[in-house]
A protein has these predicted regions:
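Active-site cofactor/cluster-binding pocket
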Residues: 1-176
Length: 176
């Protein structure tokens, strides 16, 4: 069983990203559990979400204490407490420019990539593409299918934009 913790702030799309990630993993044949955890419900407040995935049945519903993967939507949140949440051999993906990439820490300026493509900060979607490119799951095809399903009511233009953002994050991982 693999576990992911997503850290961000209210309004950054942490909940949506966890939903897309969970649905994509399901499409790739994993059993999944996903749930957000909120503090005060206001824009900018710290938010986290959890995703578990396994090829076998998941029987636990508790919050994730230590993760195989951590995705950080705002590099200002990255500190020693978050680092302690990483399992041995785990990996961290950070949206930022100041954080330093090391053996198991990957940094992508997902916000800038998003602004260049659409003039808005949809870094959550860029990060999902990078997650797929770096770690091999879920497949990019499964994430795109999840985006189609989750954003179906928003129309083709929104779906096409999100697929473009996913692809940009995915492609970035191979250009490093």
């Amino acid at each position: 069983m693999d576990e992911v913790i997503l850290y961000g702030r209210g309004g950054m799309g942490v909940k949506v990203a966890s939903q897309i990630l969970a649905v994509a993993l399901f499409y790739d044949g994993y059993d999944i559990r996903a749930f957000p955890e909120y503090g005060p419900e206001r824009r900018g407040a710290p938010v986290k979400a959890f995703v578990r995935f396994s090829k076998s049945k998941i029987k636990t519903y508790e919050p994730i204490e230590h993760a195989d993967y951590i995705i950080i939507f705002d590099e200002g949140l990255f500190d020693s407490e978050i680092r302690k949440k990483l399992k041995k051999g785990g990996r961290i993906l950070i949206n930022g420019v100041r954080a330093k990439g090391k053996d198991n820490i990957y940094v992508i300026d997902a916000s800038s990539i998003s602004f260049k493509l659409c003039g808005r900060n949809f870094s959550n979607i860029v990060l999902l593409g990078a997650f797929s490119g770096l770690f091999g799951c879920p497949s990019l095809q499964a994430i795109k299918k999840a985006v189609e399903d989750i954003f179906e009511a928003k129309g083709e233009e929104v779906i096409a934009l999100n697929k473009k953002l996913l692809q940009a994050g995915y492609d970035y991982t191979f250009s490093r």
